[in-house]
C-alpha cells in the first residue's frame, strides 16, 4: 500500500510501473483513445469533473489527479490485480489516510463489478473528485464525513471486462460483452455461497456471522475463485468495514439482502435478520434519486418484472435469486452491511448522459454514506482499559452478531428503537445494556468486561448466570 505524502506517489508508480502517463508520456493500451482525443474530451469538465468514460490509463490518471489536489486527506492503494494484470485501484479519503482510527467507521463503494455496467465506475471517479473539491471549499457535510469516516472508493472491480466492453465500436454496446472477467467468470456469482450455510445454521444451530473466520488460506487455494474475487475477500477480511454499496447497471433500484432464496425458488422474499435496517438503508439511497423513487416509472425493459420494487427498493430474493453474490458475502463473512444499487436502464449508456446520471445520484451517494453514523457504536475493554478484540456484540431479537475490531471498537447499524445489547468474549463475564437508538447520530455504548480467568472452574457457570441477571436488571 502506498504511504502518505510524496512517498505515496512513488509507491504507486512503482506498483504500477507506469509513471510515464503522469510525467508527460502516454500509457497507451490497445483500443484506448488517442492522447489528442483525451485532451479534447477533458475540456468537457465542470469543477474538475470530466463527464466522460475513463479507460484504464485515464482512470489511474483521474485518481492521481484527486490525490495531487487533496494529498492531506487522500491515498491511493491497490488490493490486487485482475486476471490480465490491471491494478484494482482504491482511493481512500480520510483526515488520517492509511490509518484505522479507533472509533472511526470504515466505508466502501465498489463499482464496475460487471465490466459492461459502466455508470457506477464513472460515478465513483466523479465522487472522489467531488469529495476533494467540496472538502477544500469547506462544505460542512463533506468535511464532517471525511473527519469522521474512512472512505474507500474502488471505481472498477473488473477493469478487464470494462476494457473489452469499451473497445466495441459505436455507442450501442452489446448487453453481455465484458460482463464477466477475462476468464469468463461472473464475479457476482463467484463468492463462497455463505447463504446456504447460514440457512442450515438457522435450522440446526450454528454461527450467524463471520462464516469464513480464519479461512484466508482456504480462499487462496480455491482454484474456482477469480483473482478479483480473492482480492476483495482479503480486503473485506482485513479492514473492519461497516457499510458498503456495490454499484451495477441494467435497472433502477436499490437491492438489499438476502439475494439468494431459502427454498431455491427463482423469486421469493428472503429476509435477513437485519431486514428493517437494510430496507432503511436502501431507501436512504433511492429516495434521493428522482427516477429510481418515481412510483410511476415504467419498467426499464418491456418484459421486466419489477413487481417486487417498493419506493425504488427491492429485496434481492424477491426480485431474482443470486447465489454466490458479493452483497450477501459481506454480511455473512464480516461486520459489513452491503446493498446493491442498479443505476441505469442501459448498462453502457452514451457518454453525453453521464452528467445527468451524476446529477441524479450525487445526493444519493452522499446520503448513503451518511448512514454509517446510525445505530450504536462504542468500545469493548477489560477492567484495566485494555481493548478486547473479537468480542461479540449481540442484539436481543436480531439473530446476527457483530464483533469488535482490534482496538475494541465496534459499530452496530440499527433503526431507531429500544434495544438490549450484550457484549461477550471468551474468558470474560458478559455484560448487557439497554439503549435507546435515535435515527442519528449513533448512540455511544461502551462495555467493560471482567475476566474470570482466576476464578475456580466450579464458580464460573454460577457467576456467569448471576452476572447476566444483574446486568440486565440494573443496566450496567
UniProtKB/Swiss-Prot annotation:
GO cellular component: extracellular space; transport vesicle membrane
PANTHER family, sorted: CARBOXYPEPTIDASE E, PROTEASE M14 CARBOXYPEPTIDASE
CDD domains: M14_CPE, Peptidase_M14NE-CP-C_like
SUBUNIT field: Interacts with secretogranin III/SCG3.
Localisation: Cytoplasmic vesicle, Secretory vesicle; Cytoplasmic vesicle, Secretory vesicle membrane; Secreted
SUPFAM superfamilies on file: Carboxypeptidase regulatory domain-like, Zn-dependent exopeptidases
Membrane association type: Peripheral membrane protein
Cofactor note as given: Binds 1 zinc ion per subunit.
Enzyme Commission number(s) from the entry: 3.4.17.10
Enzyme class, first EC level, given as a word: hydrolase
Record Pfam families: CarboxypepD_reg, Peptidase_M14
Annotated propeptide span(s): 26-42
GO MF terms, alphabetically ordered: metallocarboxypeptidase activity; zinc ion binding
Domain of life: Eukaryota
UniProt entry keywords in alphabetical sequence: Carboxypeptidase, Cleavage on pair of basic residues, Cytoplasmic vesicle, Glycoprotein, Hydrolase, Membrane, Metal-binding, Metalloprotease, Protease, Secreted, Signal, Zinc, Zymogen
Matching InterPro entries: CarboxyPept-like_regulatory (IPR008969), M14_CPE_CPD (IPR034232), Peptidase_M14 (IPR000834), Peptidase_M14_domain (IPR050753)
Job of this protein: Sorting receptor that directs prohormones to the regulated secretory pathway. Also acts as a prohormone processing enzyme in neuro/endocrine cells, removing dibasic residues from the C-terminal end of peptide hormone precursors after initial endoprotease cleavage.
Domain Peptidase M14 residue range list: 52-372
Protein name per Swiss-Prot or TrEMBL: Carboxypeptidase E
Main location: cytoplasm
Gene from which the chain derives: CPE
Signal peptide: 1-25
GO biological process, one term: protein processing
Glycosylation-annotated residues: 139, 390
Organism placement in taxonomy: Eukaryota, Metazoa, Chordata, Craniata, Vertebrata
Amino acid at each position: 500500500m502506498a504511504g502518505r505524502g510524496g512517498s505515496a506517489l512513488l509507491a504507486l508508480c512503482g506498483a504500477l510501473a507506469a509513471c510515464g502517463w503522469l510525467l508527460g508520456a502516454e500509457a497507451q493500451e490497445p483500443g484506448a483513445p488517442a492522447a489528442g482525443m483525451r485532451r479534447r474530451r477533458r475540456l468537457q469538465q465542470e469543477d474538475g469533473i470530466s463527464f466522460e468514460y475513463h479507460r484504464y490509463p485515464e482512470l489511474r490518471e483521474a485518481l492521481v489527479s484527486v490525490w495531487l489536489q487533496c494529498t492531506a486527506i487522500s491515498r491511493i492503494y491497490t488490493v490486487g490485480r485482475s486476471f490480465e494484470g490491471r491494478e484494482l485501484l482504491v482511493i481512500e479519503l480520510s483526515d488520517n489516510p492509511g490509518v484505522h482510527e479507533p472509533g472511526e467507521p470504515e466505508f466502501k463503494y465498489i463499482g464496475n463489478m460487471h465490466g459492461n455496467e459502466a455508470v457506477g465506475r464513472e460515478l465513483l471517479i466523479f465522487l472522489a473528485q467531488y469529495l476533494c473539491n467540496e472538502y477544500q471549499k469547506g462544505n460542512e457535510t463533506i468535511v464532517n464525513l471525511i473527519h469522521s469516516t474512512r472512505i474507500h472508493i474502488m471505481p472498477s472491480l473488473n477493469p478487464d471486462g470494462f476494457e473489452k466492453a469499451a473497445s466495441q465500436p459505436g455507442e450501442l454496446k452489446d448487453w453481455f460483452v465484458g460482463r464477466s472477467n477475462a476468464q469468463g467468470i461472473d464475479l457476482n456469482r463467484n463468492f463462497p455461497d455463505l447463504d446456504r450455510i447460514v440457512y442450515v445454521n438457522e435450522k440446526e444451530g450454528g454461527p450467524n456471522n463471520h462464516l469464513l473466520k480464519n479461512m484466508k488460506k482456504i480462499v487462496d487455494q480455491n482454484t474456482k475463485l477469480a483473482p478479483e474475487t480473492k482480492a476483495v475477500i482479503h480486503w473485506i477480511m482485513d479492514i473492519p468495514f461497516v457499510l458498503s454499496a456495490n454499484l451495477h447497471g441494467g435497472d433502477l433500484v436499490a437491492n438489499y439482502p438476502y439475494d439468494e432464496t431459502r427454498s431455491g425458488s427463482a423469486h421469493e422474499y428472503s429476509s435477513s435478520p437485519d431486514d428493517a435496517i437494510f430496507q432503511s438503508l436502501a431507501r436512504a439511497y433511492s429516495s434521493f434519486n428522482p427516477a429510481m423513487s418515481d412510483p410511476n416509472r415504467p419498467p426499464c425493459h418491456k418484459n421486466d418484472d419489477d413487481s417486487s420494487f417498493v419506493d425504488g427498493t427491492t429485496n434481492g430474493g424477491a426480485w431474482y435469486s443470486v447465489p454466490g453474490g458479493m452483497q450477501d458475502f459481506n454480511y455473512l463473512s464480516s461486520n459489513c452491511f452491503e446493498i446493491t444499487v442498479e443505476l441505469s436502464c442501459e448498462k453502457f449508456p452514451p457518454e453525453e448522459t453521464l452528467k445527468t446520471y451524476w446529477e441524479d445520484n450525487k445526493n444519493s451517494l452522499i446520503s448513503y454514506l451518511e448512514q454509517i453514523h446510525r445505530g450504536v457504536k462504542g468500545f469493548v475493554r477489560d477492567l484495566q482499559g485494555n481493548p478486547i478484540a473479537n468480542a461479540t456484540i449481540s442484539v436481543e431479537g436480531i439473530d446476527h452478531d457483530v464483533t469488535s475490531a482490534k482496538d475494541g471498537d465496534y459499530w452496530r447499524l440499527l433503526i431507531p428503537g429500544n434495544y438490549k445489547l450484550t457484549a461477550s468474549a471468551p474468558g470474560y463475564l458478559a455484560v448487557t445494556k439497554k439503549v435507546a437508538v435515535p435515527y442519528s447520530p449513533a448512540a455511544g455504548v461502551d462495555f467493560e468486561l471482567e475476566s474470570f480467568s482466576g476464578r475456580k472452574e466450579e464458580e464460573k457457570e454460577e457467576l456467569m448466570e448471576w452476572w447476566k441477571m444483574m446486568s440486565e436488571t440494573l443496566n450496567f
